[in-house]
Amino acid sequence: MEKLGEDFFTKPTLMLAELLLGKIFVHNTGDGRCYRGKIVETEAYLAEGDEACHAYRGMTKRNRPMYGSPGTLYVYFSYGCHHLMNIVTEPAGVAGAVLIRAMEPIEGLEDMKRNRGLERTVDLLNGPGKLTRAMEITLSHNGASLSGDTVFIEKREDTAPHKICSSKRIGITKSTGLLWRRYVSDSFFVSGKKAGKAC
Protein backbone atom coordinates (compact mmCIF):
# COMPACT_ATOMS: atom_id res chain seq x y z
CA MET A 1 0.00 0.00 0.00
CA GLU A 2 1.49 3.33 -1.07
CA LYS A 3 1.75 6.15 1.46
CA LEU A 4 1.79 9.90 1.07
CA GLY A 5 5.37 11.16 1.41
CA GLU A 6 6.89 14.18 3.12
CA ASP A 7 6.52 16.28 -0.03
CA PHE A 8 2.73 16.14 0.34
CA PHE A 9 2.89 17.60 3.86
CA THR A 10 5.40 20.36 3.00
CA LYS A 11 2.61 22.73 2.07
CA PRO A 12 0.99 25.79 3.63
CA THR A 13 -1.07 24.70 6.61
CA LEU A 14 -4.37 26.10 5.37
CA MET A 15 -3.94 24.36 2.05
CA LEU A 16 -3.17 21.05 3.73
CA ALA A 17 -6.19 21.37 6.04
CA GLU A 18 -8.28 21.19 2.88
CA LEU A 19 -6.21 18.64 0.96
CA LEU A 20 -6.41 16.15 3.83
CA LEU A 21 -10.20 15.94 3.53
CA GLY A 22 -11.13 12.66 1.90
CA LYS A 23 -7.75 11.08 2.65
CA ILE A 24 -7.53 7.77 4.53
CA PHE A 25 -5.63 7.70 7.83
CA VAL A 26 -4.30 4.29 8.87
CA HIS A 27 -3.10 2.97 12.23
CA ASN A 28 -1.58 -0.52 12.33
CA THR A 29 -1.43 -1.47 16.00
CA GLY A 30 1.29 -4.11 15.60
CA ASP A 31 -0.83 -6.96 16.95
CA GLY A 32 -2.66 -7.71 13.72
CA ARG A 33 -5.35 -5.05 14.05
CA CYS A 34 -5.79 -2.11 11.70
CA TYR A 35 -7.82 1.08 11.98
CA ARG A 36 -8.73 3.11 8.90
CA GLY A 37 -10.77 6.30 8.71
CA LYS A 38 -11.57 8.91 6.06
CA ILE A 39 -10.75 12.43 7.23
CA VAL A 40 -13.83 14.68 7.01
CA GLU A 41 -12.96 17.61 9.29
CA THR A 42 -9.76 19.51 10.11
CA GLU A 43 -8.51 22.72 11.72
CA ALA A 44 -5.37 24.68 10.85
CA TYR A 45 -2.99 26.15 13.45
CA LEU A 46 -0.01 28.41 12.71
CA ALA A 47 2.56 29.91 15.07
CA GLU A 48 2.59 33.25 13.28
CA GLY A 49 -0.39 35.42 14.16
CA ASP A 50 -2.49 32.64 15.69
CA GLU A 51 -2.80 32.92 19.47
CA ALA A 52 -4.65 29.60 19.64
CA CYS A 53 -1.60 27.78 18.29
CA HIS A 54 0.59 26.00 20.86
CA ALA A 55 3.68 27.46 19.17
CA TYR A 56 2.47 31.07 19.19
CA ARG A 57 5.01 32.04 21.89
CA GLY A 58 7.82 29.88 20.54
CA MET A 59 9.22 26.41 21.01
CA THR A 60 8.70 24.46 24.23
CA LYS A 61 9.31 20.86 25.21
CA ARG A 62 5.63 20.13 24.59
CA ASN A 63 5.29 21.68 21.14
CA ARG A 64 8.74 20.70 19.80
CA PRO A 65 7.26 18.22 17.26
CA MET A 66 5.48 21.14 15.54
CA TYR A 67 8.90 22.40 14.43
CA GLY A 68 9.95 19.03 13.06
CA SER A 69 9.65 17.42 9.67
CA PRO A 70 6.35 17.80 7.85
CA GLY A 71 4.30 14.63 8.04
CA THR A 72 5.09 14.11 11.73
CA LEU A 73 2.36 13.52 14.30
CA TYR A 74 1.95 16.02 17.12
CA VAL A 75 -0.15 14.32 19.80
CA TYR A 76 -0.89 15.99 23.12
CA PHE A 77 -3.05 15.35 26.18
CA SER A 78 -5.81 17.95 26.58
CA TYR A 79 -7.40 18.85 29.92
CA GLY A 80 -6.25 15.57 31.42
CA CYS A 81 -8.76 13.48 29.51
CA HIS A 82 -8.27 13.50 25.71
CA HIS A 83 -5.44 12.86 23.29
CA LEU A 84 -5.58 15.15 20.25
CA MET A 85 -3.80 14.30 17.00
CA ASN A 86 -2.27 16.86 14.66
CA ILE A 87 -0.26 16.48 11.46
CA VAL A 88 2.78 18.76 11.25
CA THR A 89 2.93 20.95 8.15
CA GLU A 90 5.23 23.58 6.63
CA PRO A 91 8.99 23.14 6.15
CA ALA A 92 11.01 21.98 9.17
CA GLY A 93 11.60 24.84 11.60
CA VAL A 94 8.29 26.56 10.78
CA ALA A 95 5.61 25.66 13.32
CA GLY A 96 2.28 24.67 11.82
CA ALA A 97 -0.10 21.75 12.17
CA VAL A 98 -3.51 20.47 11.14
CA LEU A 99 -5.75 19.08 13.87
CA ILE A 100 -7.74 16.05 12.74
CA ARG A 101 -11.20 16.74 14.13
CA ALA A 102 -13.31 13.95 12.65
CA MET A 103 -13.21 10.89 10.43
CA GLU A 104 -15.61 8.45 8.84
CA PRO A 105 -14.88 4.91 10.10
CA ILE A 106 -13.79 2.47 7.40
CA GLU A 107 -11.97 -0.44 9.03
CA GLY A 108 -11.72 -1.75 12.58
CA LEU A 109 -15.28 -0.79 13.53
CA GLU A 110 -15.80 -3.49 16.16
CA ASP A 111 -12.60 -2.54 17.96
CA MET A 112 -13.55 1.14 17.71
CA LYS A 113 -16.93 0.41 19.27
CA ARG A 114 -15.31 -1.51 22.11
CA ASN A 115 -12.76 1.24 22.72
CA ARG A 116 -15.47 3.91 22.83
CA GLY A 117 -18.16 1.80 24.56
CA LEU A 118 -20.59 2.78 21.80
CA GLU A 119 -22.58 1.07 19.08
CA ARG A 120 -23.57 3.98 16.82
CA THR A 121 -21.03 4.15 13.99
CA VAL A 122 -21.74 7.82 13.34
CA ASP A 123 -20.57 8.74 16.85
CA LEU A 124 -17.29 6.82 16.89
CA LEU A 125 -14.91 9.36 15.32
CA ASN A 126 -16.88 12.63 15.32
CA GLY A 127 -14.52 14.57 17.56
CA PRO A 128 -10.74 14.90 17.99
CA GLY A 129 -10.67 13.17 21.38
CA LYS A 130 -13.16 10.53 20.29
CA LEU A 131 -11.18 9.44 17.25
CA THR A 132 -7.90 9.03 19.14
CA ARG A 133 -9.60 6.86 21.77
CA ALA A 134 -11.37 4.78 19.13
CA MET A 135 -8.21 4.31 17.03
CA GLU A 136 -5.83 3.89 20.00
CA ILE A 137 -3.71 6.97 19.29
CA THR A 138 -1.82 8.03 22.43
CA LEU A 139 1.21 10.06 23.50
CA SER A 140 3.33 7.13 22.33
CA HIS A 141 2.60 8.33 18.79
CA ASN A 142 3.80 11.88 19.45
CA GLY A 143 6.61 12.59 16.99
CA ALA A 144 5.84 9.53 14.86
CA SER A 145 6.48 9.87 11.14
CA LEU A 146 3.66 9.25 8.69
CA SER A 147 6.21 7.67 6.35
CA GLY A 148 6.43 4.52 8.49
CA ASP A 149 4.27 1.42 8.67
CA THR A 150 2.46 2.14 11.95
CA VAL A 151 0.64 5.37 11.11
CA PHE A 152 0.31 6.83 7.63
CA ILE A 153 -2.00 8.39 5.05
CA GLU A 154 -2.87 6.25 2.05
CA LYS A 155 -1.75 7.55 -1.31
CA ARG A 156 -4.91 7.35 -3.34
CA GLU A 157 -7.41 9.73 -4.81
CA ASP A 158 -10.82 10.19 -3.25
CA THR A 159 -13.07 9.66 -6.25
CA ALA A 160 -16.23 10.80 -4.48
CA PRO A 161 -16.77 14.53 -5.08
CA HIS A 162 -17.46 16.60 -1.99
CA LYS A 163 -18.14 20.22 -1.18
CA ILE A 164 -15.70 21.70 1.32
CA CYS A 165 -16.86 24.36 3.75
CA SER A 166 -15.05 26.59 6.23
CA SER A 167 -15.97 28.00 9.62
CA LYS A 168 -14.50 29.25 12.87
CA ARG A 169 -12.55 26.70 14.86
CA ILE A 170 -14.27 24.92 17.73
CA GLY A 171 -13.51 25.11 21.45
CA ILE A 172 -10.88 27.86 21.45
CA THR A 173 -10.86 31.25 23.20
CA LYS A 174 -8.14 33.06 21.22
CA SER A 175 -7.95 34.07 17.55
CA THR A 176 -11.58 33.05 17.37
CA GLY A 177 -12.37 35.01 14.22
CA LEU A 178 -10.22 32.92 11.90
CA LEU A 179 -12.16 30.69 9.51
CA TRP A 180 -9.58 27.91 9.69
CA ARG A 181 -11.86 24.91 10.16
CA ARG A 182 -12.52 22.80 7.06
CA TYR A 183 -15.09 20.05 6.69
CA VAL A 184 -16.97 17.99 4.12
CA SER A 185 -20.38 19.63 3.98
CA ASP A 186 -22.47 16.51 3.34
CA SER A 187 -20.68 14.20 5.80
CA PHE A 188 -22.67 12.78 8.71
CA PHE A 189 -19.43 12.28 10.66
CA VAL A 190 -18.29 15.87 11.35
CA SER A 191 -17.94 16.92 14.98
CA GLY A 192 -19.67 20.28 15.12
CA LYS A 193 -22.40 22.31 13.51
CA LYS A 194 -22.21 22.59 9.75
CA ALA A 195 -22.28 26.36 9.90
CA GLY A 196 -19.93 28.12 7.55
CA LYS A 197 -19.37 29.06 3.97
CA ALA A 198 -18.20 27.19 0.92
CA CYS A 199 -14.49 27.52 0.18
UniProtKB/Swiss-Prot annotation:
| Entry EC no(s) | 3.2.2.-
Which CDD domains does the annotation name?
A: AAG
A GO molecular-function descriptor? DNA binding
Q: Which UniProt keywords apply?
A: DNA damage, DNA repair, Hydrolase
A Pfam family hit: Pur_DNA_glyco
The family assignment reads: Belongs to the DNA glycosylase MPG family.
Please give the superkingdom of this protein's source. Bacteria
Q: Which GO terms describe its biological process?
A: base-excision repair
The protein's matches in NCBIfam families, at most eight in alphabetical order, are given as: 3mg, PRK00802.1-3
Cleaved signal peptide residues: none
* Residue ranges crossing the lipid bilayer per the database entry: none
InterPro entries, A to Z: Formyl_transferase-like_C_sf, MPG, MPG_sf
Q: What protein does this entry describe?
A: Putative 3-methyladenine DNA glycosylase
Q: Does the keyword Metal-binding apply?
A: no
